[in-house]
C-alpha cells in the first residue's frame, strides 16, 4: 500500500512538471523541505518517471525524520546545519551531504519548485501551520529566485491499525485524520497564497 502511495505522489508531481514550460525547455530543479514523508515523495521513483517522460530533473530533499514546520523555522532562525541533504542529479545518482543548513541548500541550485510540509503528527492541525508556515515561507522566498513556485505537500493519514502516538490527535480514526489533513492543507494554502498542493493524501 505504501509503495502505491509513493507512486501516486510521484505521478502528481510529474503531472505538474509535464504541464509546465520546463518540461521541454530545461532541467527542472525540485527541492523538498520536509521529513520522511518527503523522502517517500521525491527520493523514490520521481527521477525515473520524469526521465521516462523526457523530463530532466535535479531533485533535492532536506531531511530530518519527523521534522515539523516549527522545527524548520527554528533551524532557519539559527542557521542550523541540522539536515541531511540528499540530492539526485540528472544522472539519477543520489548523493548525500550531512550537516547542511536551509540557507546553504536554498543557494545550491536555481530551484524551480520548493515543497513544504508539516510533520505527520500535526498535519491535520491548522493552528500548527498558522503558527510557523508564514515565517518559513518568508525565509525561503527571500533566498529564492522570483520564478520559484512553492508547493504544499498534503501527506496521507495513518493506517487504521497505526500505533503512532500522534494518531491520538485524530481519535485514532483514519477518516477523521484524512479529513483534518485535507481541510488544514486547503486552509493553509489559501491563507499563504500557495497555488500548488500535492494531494498525496487523497
What are these regions (language model features)?
Residues 1-8:
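Bacterial N-terminal signal peptides that target proteins for export
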Residues 8-18:
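Bacterial N-terminal signal peptides
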Residues 19-23:
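Sec/Tat signal peptide C-region and signal peptidase I cleavage site
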Residues 25, 52-54, 145, 191:
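Short, well-ordered coil/turn elements that cap or connect secondary structure elements
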Residues 28, 40-129:
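Conserved SGNH/GDSL esterase-like catalytic core that processes O-acyl groups on lipids
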Residues 31-33, 153:
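Short hydrophobic segments within beta-strands
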Residues 34-38:
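Short polar catalytic/cofactor-binding loops
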Residues 98-202:
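Alpha-helical cap/lid subdomain in secreted, periplasmic
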Amino acid at each position: 500500500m505504501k509503495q502505491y502511495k509513493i507512486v501516486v505522489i510521484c505521478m502528481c508531481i510529474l503531472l505538474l512538471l509535464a504541464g509546465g514550460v520546463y518540461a521541454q525547455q530545461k532541467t527542472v530543479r525540485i527541492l523538498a523541505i520536509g521529513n520522511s514523508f518527503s523522502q517517500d515523495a521525491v527520493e523514490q521513483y520521481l527521477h525515473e518517471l520524469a526521465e521516462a517522460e523526457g523530463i530532466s530533473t535535479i531533485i533535492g530533499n532536506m531531511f530530518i525524520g519527523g521534522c515539523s514546520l516549527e522545527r524548520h523555522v527554528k533551524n532557519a532562525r539559527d542557521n542550523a546545519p541540522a539536515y541531511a541533504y540528499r540530492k539526485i542529479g540528472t544522472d539519477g545518482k543520489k548523493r548525500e551531504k550531512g550537516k547542511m543548513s536551509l540557507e546553504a541548500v536554498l543557494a545550491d541550485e536555481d530551484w524551480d519548485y520548493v515543497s513544504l510540509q508539516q510533520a505527520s503528527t500535526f498535519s491535520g492541525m491548522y493552528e500548527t501551520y498558522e503558527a510557523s508556515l508564514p515565517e518559513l515561507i518568508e525565509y525561503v522566498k527571500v533566498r529564492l529566485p522570483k520564478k520559484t513556485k512553492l508547493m504544499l505537500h498534503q501527506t496521507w493519514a495513518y493506517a487504521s491499525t497505526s500505533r503512532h502516538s500522534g494518531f491520538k490527535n485524530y481519535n485514532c480514526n483514519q477518516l477523521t485524520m484524512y479529513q483534518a489533513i485535507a481541510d488544514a492543507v486547503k486552509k493553509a494554502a489559501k491563507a499563504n497564497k500557495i497555488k500548488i498542493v500535492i494531494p498525496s493524501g487523497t
